[in-house]
Amino acid sequence: MASFLLLPSSLRHVSFFHPRACPLLKLRFSSTAHMAEQRTYAEAIKLLDSLQSNRAVVSSISSTPSDMNLNAIPEMLEWTRKAGYQPKDLAARGLKYIHVAGTKGKGSVSVMVENILLQYWRSKSRPEALGRIGLYTSPHLIHVRERIRIDGLPISEALFTRYFYELWDRFSLAEEGPDSETKPGYFRYLTLLAFHTFIQEGVGTAIIECGIGGEYDSTNILPQEAVTACAVTSLGIDHKGMLGETVEEIAWHKGGIMKAGVPAFSSEQIPEAQAVLEERASEKGVEFTVVERSSALEDLKLGLEGDFQKDNASLAITVAALHLKTLGVTEVTTSTELPEQFITGLETVRWPARCQYLIDGTTEWLIDGAHTLESIASTAAWFLEKHTSATAMRAPWSRNLLPPYGIASYMRNRSDPGI
């Protein structure tokens, strides 16, 4: 028997912009001894969960986002300062970044780039210019530590706890008065925690996925000189309360990650979205390229299923190749045959709950998540492809399908602010 699981949209909306939308819970420890006793991973998670939630932010600003959008980056820079960093410090020790935005596929592109680069880092030659590989994504599936990865693995509970409290103490020392906000909100805290962790752990390359949008996203404080490439994945309508009602408005926000002098790339877009991205690139003095599906993928079996993943893989190939070239590691001609490291990276990449096929006893699961109508269509196409293939092979499960789960949840949540 096979089941089809479409994750509810609520699992997909876990990023935000603005901490002033509602009061933060102000937490105090009564004594140093008490603080020491409570400094466990479990307590760190409780403190993190007490911070302003993403959904609260979306709900509070959905009707009047303009002013708070304009305040987003200045506020994030102030929190960065309170964390002990200036923007230029994010480039400490030669740390280089790849910045990824988009509506659909930005997590997939990010993890593909990570796995390609890991093949070079794990090789016998181990190029020092590349350095350890960091990845920051959202949301997480099970554990919040999944959002911050180093060398392909989530950071440990011990490391998360250590760096979480280092930032917590810095924010506490920076409190300016009884009415001031004492801590950044959930997504901002995790973003700063990722930067802090990467710097402290000596990461050389970090792939950073935007939370919501791009122009005013908390990740958009990266120093221009530290970014080797910006990528925009497929665009669609999402987070309307924060990004706008049209794909043109949304494209404007996503294109906000482009940085002067840094090459920017995009998957193929609908004409309206592509035109806006081209305008933004022109405004910022950016060399902008639309990446077509690579012919080198025709005979390649990607680790992530779904035909649309070939578009994501094409973007990942282009971005990874430029990053390697910029660092002087290798020059890759991606228009023909791919290097072994690229092939291995794309074939072995894994990203749970993204077009994932699982066998559990006698039940076979087809699992994906979607938060836009276009994403649901892509998920349905993948499911149909699997079902058609199974039917052709007369697979037993093709005749015993459980009804899809999650469609009703998605439709019910379509009225939620910012979705």
Language-model-derived ranges and their functions:
Residues 76-79, 113, 117, 191-198, ...:
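Buried hydrophobic packing segments
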Residues 99-101, 134-137, 208-211, 233, ...:
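Short beta-strand segments
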Residues 212-284, 416-418:
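Conserved catalytic-core segment of NTP-binding enzymes
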Residues 291-295:
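Beta-strand-loop-alpha "switch" segments that mediate conformational coupling across diverse proteins
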Residues 205-208, 218-231, 235-239, 249, ...:
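Nucleotide phosphate-binding/pyrophosphate-handling subdomain across enzymes
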Residues 60-73, 77-78, 86-94, 119-225, ...:
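ATP-dependent carboxylate-amine ligase catalytic core
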